[in-house]
A protein has these predicted regions:
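Rossmann-fold NAD(P)-binding glycine/threonine-rich loop
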Residues: 2-10, 108-165
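Glycine-rich phosphate/diphosphate-binding loop of Rossmann-like nucleotide-binding domains
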Residues: 8-106, 110, 115, 124-125, ...
Length: 165
């Protein structure tokens, strides 16, 4: 996924040998739950080379309308509220709240953040970039953190390893 040649091929339609594991995992989740993305408005919060940019490029190649934001985008909630599918990978715990999303949105929370939690033996717990408890009643689907995108990313890494033997 990250070799310079493959990274360059990601910008052209169907030329990359591998899509990076996390974006491919996100597509697998959408496919598994029969969530249509062709023609849908996808908002990507986060533009990293690992998740945000490859995910946005692949969504564009698959005929979605894509908007890319980052955590400092002015009035970001006005943009995220337009999303049919909201993909968040910006590394800010509980950034996305219910007033950021429209009713029936599909959310893929790629974020994995540790926050202090004195009730846990290790002193922290893992949360996503979306405040799941806050948005839960408005969403159609949302991936959990932990246990959502992460395990599917690992499965894609294994798939790539086997395919490249």
């Amino acid at each position: 996924g990250f070799h310079t040649i493959n990274s360059g091929k990601l910008t052209s339609y169907n030329n990359a040998k591998f899509i990076p594991c996390t974006p491919e995992g996100c597509f697998e989740i959408l496919k598994y739950y029969n969530i249509e993305y062709v023609g849908k408005h996808v908002v990507m919060v986060g533009g990293s080379k690992v998740v945000g940019l490859p995910m946005a490029l692949q969504m564009l190649h698959k005929e979605s309308t894509i908007t890319i934001c980052h955590k400092l985008t002015e009035n970001i909630q006005n943009i995220t509220r337009l999303a049919d599918i909201l993909i968040v990978a910006c590394g800010v715990p509980h950034l996305v709240k219910k007033d950021w999303v429209k009713e029936g949105v599909v959310i893929i929370d790629v974020g994995i953040n540790s926050i202090p939690d004195a009730s846990k033996k290790r002193g922290y717990r893992l949360v996503g970039d979306v405040d799941t408890d806050d948005v839960y009643e408005k969403v159609k689907y949302i991936t959990p953190v932990p246990g959502g995108v992460g395990p599917v990313t690992i499965a894609m890494l294994i798939k790539h390893s086997v395919e490249n033997l």
